Amino acid sequence: MLIVQQFQKRSFIIPSLISSGLSYLSKDIRLADKMEDGELHFPKTEFEKSQNTSRPLFQRPEPNYPGHVPLYNFEKLLMFLGSSIGAFVNPTNNNFIVSLGESTAFPWVLNRLRTQMLNDPSGRQILKERPHMTSKSLNLDELKNYPDNSLGKSYFLWLEREGVSPDTRVPVKYITDPELAFVFQRYRECHDFYHTITGLPIVREGEIALKLFEFMNLGIPMTGLGALFAPIPIKSSQRRRLLSVYYPWAVKNGTICKPLINVYWEKIMKKDIDVLRSELGIEKPPDMRELRKKARSKKKQVA
Amino acid sequence: MFQVIRRFATSVSNVADIVIIGGGPAGLTLGTALKNSPVTKHLKIHLVEGGKIIEPLNSFLETPPPNYLNRVVSLTPSTIGFLDSIGAWSHFNQERTQSYDDIVTYDGVSGARMNFEHPDIATMVETTNIQAGLLSRLNELNSQQEVKLVIQEDTKVTSIAKDSITQWPTLKLSNGDSLTCRLLVGCDGYNSPVRHFAGIESRGWSYNRWGVVATFKFADTEFRFPTGWQRFLPTGPLALLPLPNGYTSMVWSTTPELAEMLLSLDETEFLSMVNAGTRLSTEELSMIYDLAKSKSPDLLEQIQWRLNLFAGKLKPADEENFPLQVSEIVTGSRARFPLKLSHADTYVEDRVALVGDAAHTTHPLAGQGLNMGQEDVKSLVGALERATSRGLDIGNSLALEPYFSERWPQNHVLLGVMDKIHKIYSTDFAPLVAARSFGVDVLNSLGPIKDFMVGRISGNSKR
């Protein structure tokens, strides 16, 4: 009881001492601030006082390219934590995948990709021209008139079959270096061409298989995380099919095929897709939609 | 009988106290310093040089060439102090020298940088200017003295042997003369014949690197105080050192195949390549090297593209972290030389002493090679002065040993430090880059330690 009383007494005395001491010092502190700002001898005019020149408490650095949002490292870490949990729980939400991709696109990873591009003539051309893929730049309407089995036609057919458009790609926001941001943007925009050339559908299973293929070929961390964790929550029959058919294919083909980031897709639309595949060194995997259909009908028969 | 007399006569007329082999900066400084010293000026000294030097060196002072020569060295304050003390510095063509206060080194992989500041931390001088100034001072000394130093130019040493009676070194010269001396000093460079004669082993290794040199003019875009720049690329450092009027002398140490590539470029390509070398990342450089090696026609365009990207990213405040771009090359100033480390087991034998490159060669990354030779000369002259004033035979090991025991350990430490710096920087292995960058950042913020280092490289704290 005694201690409490004493404590209470002190808790009254000490703060009052501190505050009185501060109020005694504060005059000096304010005076020093004034001297430092030069206001003591050159007081502010009324006009200067009316201008609000004080800086805001928090200000982001200048963006390095249009649309850039400079992040501090701790923000990137938070973004990584949030988006990785989100992507695991709800992988169909594109926002999570996009943020996971950017928060793990470390400079050294993108730097390695850029080095690959610099050392390849067409990769260099891509870096120099910085093309952006949109339905307009790709001339989608013309593509359907391209010869059968050309890359352009196959791409068009694939877009139709899966019901997607090249305009849905989100622009890169959080990568610091403009050129590295372009490299990541390029990966994102070319993703549909990887679907086209492998024939993998955009269903969850197909995306997972393609992620491992991309990781083996490009080494982007997000794709590796996807290939590692995404198969955990899916159906066991699908996982079995992935592990027995598509993962071995992805490991083999992703490793031996030429770096896909160096392919200037827009310039080779007329090329025969089989010829292109053999040039790049990719074997087409078994059609996933077919396999799924077969498995489903088998299941029905058994039932 | 006649033969005996004749032989006697020849040997008498051609006996010298000291014969210096080599008319480079080391040999000329030694001759000048000995003639300048009141104790040793009476000695009979011959300087034998294989090439023609007197006429070219005199004409360098009388009618200086319009362009800077490509053999340029940086002199430390200590070296300049010594040259001044023997009265030679005022004979140099001062307009062609450039002193500077600031050296900036930066890591080609991580960008970690270090600033060395000290008034007149170094002075850039053409080696021909050094030789010409020394020769001019030597002529002045000769005109004041009875015993003159004899320069035998355009004369090669065909053989060195020991005299059968006196055991003194006897030289056979290409003009048919023979020359016997009490002390033979080898200032005759890396492949020193004198060292071979004395049977002194020189140990070391080739760096498997070449130094590519050239003289440039900086682009006239903004005012800069003269500054020494050095960028450590994994293939070797690229240094741009200031000359007067915005000119700059480059030494780019690099692998033999890249050196060959650099020499095979045309001059505009070479200019762009040097600008790329001072700024672009190692990945970009390796792409550019590959393009250059394959003689790609769009090399210039690709370099310009990367340089423009670099300039676009650079914030105005960071511009002074890099040297200005070079915009002109002095035609025909490109050359290369091999880099190696070597150190002789000893500098002195009975009646033989080695000075400068004959005794040691080093990597040019801190511009210490010639300065070490000047320190050698200073020390050797001191030893000879002491020996003379004590009445010792100047060719005797007792007279020469102090020179060796003073200089060898100091040179050995410097050679070792240069070697380690070269090795630490010749990798782009990430953990090592991180470690060396951390070290540089720490050192750069520790004033006293940096001052000590500046003292060492500028030769101020030695005594």
Swiss-Prot record, chain A:
The prosthetic group or cofactor this protein requires is: Zn(2+)
Protein EC: 4.1.1.130
For this entry, list what GO says about its biological process. ubiquinone biosynthetic process
Q: Which InterPro entries match?
A: Coq4, Coq4_euk
* GO (cellular component) term, any one: extrinsic component of mitochondrial inner membrane
State whether it acts alone or in a complex, and with which partners, per the record.
Answer: Component of a multi-subunit COQ enzyme complex, composed of at least COQ3, COQ4, COQ5, COQ6, COQ7 and COQ9.
Q: Tell me the HAMAP family matching this sequence.
A: Coq4
The name this protein carries in UniProt is: Ubiquinone biosynthesis protein COQ4, mitochondrial
Q: Which gene encodes it?
A: COQ4
